Every structure is written in structure tokens, then in C-alpha cells.
Amino acid sequence: MPKPGELTFVAPRGAKKPPRHLADLSPAERKEAVAAIGEKPFRAKQLSQHYFARYAHDPEQWTDIPAGSRAKLQEALLPDLMTVVRHLSTDQDTTRKTLWRLFDGTLVESVLMRYPDRVTMCISSQAGCGMNCPFCATGQAGLDRNLSTGEIVHQIVDGMRALRDGEIPGGPARLSNIVFMGMGEPLANYKRVVGAIRALTDPEPDGLGLSQRGITVSTVGLVPAIHRFADEGFKCRLAISLHAPDDELRDTLVPVNTRWKVREVLDAGWEYAARSGRRLSIEYALIRDINDQAWRGDRLGRMLKGRPVHVNLIPLNPTPGSKWTASRPEDEKAFVEAIAAHGVPVTVRDTRGQEIDGACGQLAATER
């Protein structure tokens, strides 16, 4: 467990590297990998078709590939990276949290949420998190390691398979939105997260063919990485986990603020919004008597007025051992009104998965 305020930007050394996976490679690299094991390069396209378009991970389903080649191709490009430990469901089974055991025994979680008009999946980009926010269960656990691109992508592939096969009530469906808001700070695992976005949005069969506009990447505010992300040319939405409008409080709630202050973080966010053409999201967990004062709502509204932005207020979800709790309804209402008075769009997030510790800030990946 990290000390209060301690930050970890680089994953601890010594972790075993995940096996190479199809999703880790570009289409050209997949052909090279297939040729390197003595198979014809076009097998790479067939394998991509099975994985990205049919969600078929089992070689027995690859009927257009000779039986003698399947095991070799699986070992080289589609190894078993992760297995399901368990599913926990709530909201009439329309919210499902999955606990995964990775190849090295590390545990991570993802959450699938079906609404009447859309399906959203919240995925993890790291095992644990090094940002050490004191109100977040993931942050309090510390950082174990980065996930590979393949480990990130496979969470979504499995979610899409589950939706197609009718495992979530409501009939077959397709993912509408992906949010990098599970375990980890996505921009601290920059290269692999960017690789995952490419694999998710490349047209089938090279990727999953999802829209960049349906993807949200959350960050506590790693300013250099936000500038770098703007250079990628993506149309994804950026969400900044702000949680306080003033540096004095944010230094405590979001320790990375001791490196990059609120103004620097927001300026980087405005640059991303301008270059991507997407509205910036501000995430703000409302904590009783800590950051939910109406004057802080007013200050936040003044800072955001006239900008391409939307504020998502999140009633604090309970975590084991936490001394904090959600705001009183009257304080939440006053906070919303203080922001809205400046013409800034603001909503209170519909909290899903709280009963199964699957809501924002609750992912801890334990087998208890």
C-alpha cells in the first residue's frame, strides 16, 4: 500500500511480460508473425476475422484454417491471456462486473452496463493504480503493473461476445460506448492504451470497427501525456478527474496535482478539445463536507464558463475503510445549481453497480 500522497508513474520492474497477442500487433506485423512460423501471410487476416469480427478465441471454431495450423497460430498470436474468475450482476442482471485472472495471476476487473438506449463497458488499463487518490479503492491498492494492449482489448472482445450471445438481458446487442475508467490511469500506460484504441477502432477485420467518438479516456491530469494524446488525432472524448477546483484541496484529493496544478490540467484539456473537436468532460466525485460546498461549485462554474465542457458529478461510492461518504441531497442540489448558474452543462451520474462494488472508485479486484 502506498504512503499518503506517494505517486507511481512507472510500473514496478520485474513483472513477467504478457505473451504476444494479435491485438498487440499492427496488420503488417501480424502477417510477419504468421510468416515467421511457416504459415502463409493471409492466415493473419483469417485469424483477425475470427477474433475481431466473430469474437472466436477457440481454435475449434476456425474451420477455414487447416486443423494442423490452428494450434501453432493460437500459440503464436492468440494465447490465453486471461480467464474469468467470476461474474457479479445487479440491476436485473443488466450490470455485470467481471473479475479476471491474468496469465501471471494478477487480478483486474471490468464492468458491462446495459441501458435502454446504449451499452457501455468500463475497462481497466492497469492492474491497480499509482495515482493514490485517497477516496478510490483502486488508488489505495497501489500499482502492480501495466496491462498489455491485448489484455485491454480482450476485455472488450469478451464483452461484445457476451452481448451477441444474449448473456445480458435484453436480447443480442452491440457495444455503444467504451470508457477507460476502470482500474488504472490510462495515460500512465500510454503506448498500450493508444494501441488498444487503434485496435478497437480499425475497420473489421483489422480491428473491432468501433467509433472513436464512442470512446472516453479518463485521466487525473498527466499534462505532458494529454498534449501527446492531442497529437494522435483521435476523436475520442477526454475526461478529466478533477474533484476540486482549487489547488489546496486537489493536492490532497488528487495527489498528482502537486505536479500539475488545476489551471495547467484544464489548459491541456482545452487544447485537446480544440484539436479533437470533442467537448471536454469534467468528472467530480461529491464528498460530504469535503468538496461539495456551493462556493466550490460556483468557482468551478466560473472556471468552465463559455468552454466546450460537460460536468459529470458522481455521488461518492463507498469503499472499505473510507472515512468519507456521499454528499447530502440538499448539498448536491446546491452544487449543481451553482455550476448551472454559469451556463455550464452539468448532470449527476446514474450510479450503476454499487451493490457489487462495480461503481466508480470501487474496483479493487479481490476474490473475497
UniProtKB/Swiss-Prot annotation:
<feature type="active site" description="Proton acceptor">
    <location>
        <position position="109"/>
    </location>
</feature>
<dbReference type="Pfam" id="PF04055">
    <property type="entry name" value="Radical_SAM"/>
</dbReference>
<keyword id="KW-0949">S-adenosyl-L-methionine</keyword>
<comment type="function">
    <text>Specifically methylates position 2 of adenine 2503 in 23S rRNA and position 2 of adenine 37 in tRNAs.</text>
</comment>
<keyword id="KW-0004">4Fe-4S</keyword>
<feature type="disulfide bond" description="(transient)">
    <location>
        <begin position="122"/>
        <end position="360"/>
    </location>
</feature>
<feature type="active site" description="S-methylcysteine intermediate">
    <location>
        <position position="360"/>
    </location>
</feature>
<keyword id="KW-0489">Methyltransferase</keyword>
<feature type="domain" description="Radical SAM core">
    <location>
        <begin position="115"/>
        <end position="355"/>
    </location>
</feature>
<dbReference type="GO" id="GO:0002935">
    <property type="term" value="F:tRNA (adenine(37)-C2)-methyltransferase activity"/>
</dbReference>
<dbReference type="InterPro" id="IPR027492">
    <property type="entry name" value="RNA_MTrfase_RlmN"/>
</dbReference>
<dbReference type="GO" id="GO:0019843">
    <property type="term" value="F:rRNA binding"/>
</dbReference>
<feature type="binding site">
    <location>
        <position position="218"/>
    </location>
    <ligand>
        <name>S-adenosyl-L-methionine</name>
    </ligand>
</feature>
<feature type="binding site">
    <location>
        <begin position="241"/>
        <end position="243"/>
    </location>
    <ligand>
        <name>S-adenosyl-L-methionine</name>
    </ligand>
</feature>
<dbReference type="InterPro" id="IPR007197">
    <property type="entry name" value="rSAM"/>
</dbReference>
<feature type="binding site">
    <location>
        <position position="129"/>
    </location>
    <ligand>
        <name>[4Fe-4S] cluster</name>
    </ligand>
</feature>
<feature type="binding site">
    <location>
        <position position="133"/>
    </location>
    <ligand>
        <name>[4Fe-4S] cluster</name>
    </ligand>
</feature>
<protein>
    <recommendedName>
        <fullName>Probable dual-specificity RNA methyltransferase RlmN</fullName>
        <ecNumber>2.1.1.192</ecNumber>
    </recommendedName>
</protein>
<feature type="binding site">
    <location>
        <begin position="184"/>
        <end position="185"/>
    </location>
    <ligand>
        <name>S-adenosyl-L-methionine</name>
    </ligand>
</feature>
<dbReference type="Pfam" id="PF21016">
    <property type="entry name" value="RlmN_N"/>
</dbReference>
<keyword id="KW-0408">Iron</keyword>
<feature type="region of interest" description="Disordered">
    <location>
        <begin position="1"/>
        <end position="22"/>
    </location>
</feature>
<keyword id="KW-0808">Transferase</keyword>
<feature type="binding site">
    <location>
        <position position="136"/>
    </location>
    <ligand>
        <name>[4Fe-4S] cluster</name>
    </ligand>
</feature>
<dbReference type="InterPro" id="IPR048641">
    <property type="entry name" value="RlmN_N"/>
</dbReference>
<dbReference type="GO" id="GO:0051539">
    <property type="term" value="F:4 iron, 4 sulfur cluster binding"/>
</dbReference>
<keyword id="KW-0411">Iron-sulfur</keyword>
<keyword id="KW-0698">rRNA processing</keyword>
<dbReference type="GO" id="GO:0005737">
    <property type="term" value="C:cytoplasm"/>
</dbReference>
<dbReference type="InterPro" id="IPR040072">
    <property type="entry name" value="Methyltransferase_A"/>
</dbReference>
<dbReference type="InterPro" id="IPR013785">
    <property type="entry name" value="Aldolase_TIM"/>
</dbReference>
<dbReference type="GO" id="GO:0070040">
    <property type="term" value="F:rRNA (adenine(2503)-C2-)-methyltransferase activity"/>
</dbReference>
<feature type="binding site">
    <location>
        <position position="317"/>
    </location>
    <ligand>
        <name>S-adenosyl-L-methionine</name>
    </ligand>
</feature>
<dbReference type="InterPro" id="IPR004383">
    <property type="entry name" value="rRNA_lsu_MTrfase_RlmN/Cfr"/>
</dbReference>
<keyword id="KW-0479">Metal-binding</keyword>
<keyword id="KW-0963">Cytoplasm</keyword>
<dbReference type="GO" id="GO:0030488">
    <property type="term" value="P:tRNA methylation"/>
</dbReference>
<keyword id="KW-1015">Disulfide bond</keyword>
<keyword id="KW-0819">tRNA processing</keyword>
<dbReference type="GO" id="GO:0000049">
    <property type="term" value="F:tRNA binding"/>
</dbReference>
<dbReference type="GO" id="GO:0070475">
    <property type="term" value="P:rRNA base methylation"/>
</dbReference>
<dbReference type="GO" id="GO:0046872">
    <property type="term" value="F:metal ion binding"/>
</dbReference>
